[in-house]
């Protein structure tokens, strides 16, 4: 029963995450469910069926773009969450290679969307999303708008595929979300979802405004290219004028790999892009070929996932702000707490239903984390720490700015001011009108 429950839940979450770009749980919660399913199936191999999420390379594909079959599948990576699991990976690799010397290249895992760029005679001709790993979506027109992707490279190869990650820099992400809040639109949960949503725009002009970027890190199908290692590949990609993440390092033993990974524990918050882990790859392509792949993942690489950083704090009050369409939005005013490199004093509570669902009260001790390491959110309240002084929050029945009644329409989660002449709403509209994205 648990097996079927996990499969159904993971399928549902994968659809929300990959196809809709609207995740409903954190990456860590998803990873833990996936791992539980893997463990059950390892213990009972005869229970494994072809439609299990563990047998799928990636995700279903949304409509709207033409499909394209990759020359060589874009595999996903196996995940580990602890130092000991990295050591186990190292031991497996060394055993499979008969104990011969090896090197690892360790790279930051950029939190974006994997894409495949196809060049013929040096000309960029097609950009394709990873999709389910076998078939992706043709997003060529949108990829062309990304300035860190060269439209021509110094190669006369008849066909070469460059793979990497399209991502949204944190400054672009914060500016985009501020604009979405100003427009009363739901902000993106994290830069990865913002990048994915931007690449799937039917109008490339919108994509161009989103200021996306690209890090190259792999080859797909290619001809006439002789490269012998991951380190050599990264150097060649840089010579092709691709942006290559400069933070990679090469090591000969796993303990140095682990030390390098943990050197990022206190530094990754200062990076100008989001990262959710580190990727460890066997450097030699000859050794990679000998180690091979499973149906789903390479045996020569592994992704170490950073645990989400959380903090406890107190809800001092719940305040309500008014947007230019008259929507009332609640937010938690918090005891200042340090989290992921910044001091957090406020976290969005979205709407009345969110507060009720999480049972968040004024005076509660709550756990907060940054969604996708960026936006502060209340994960849960800790009712066991209540002392009886906490207060249940109720949305105001009148507008905090003008005193007019507020209403909640059928099928909506938002409360709105009913006064078309509300001074706060008019002020917000004027502020928007003179903003960079409107009159200016």
Feature annotation, model-predicted:
Residues 1-440:
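RNA/tRNA-interacting regions in translation and RNA-turnover enzymes
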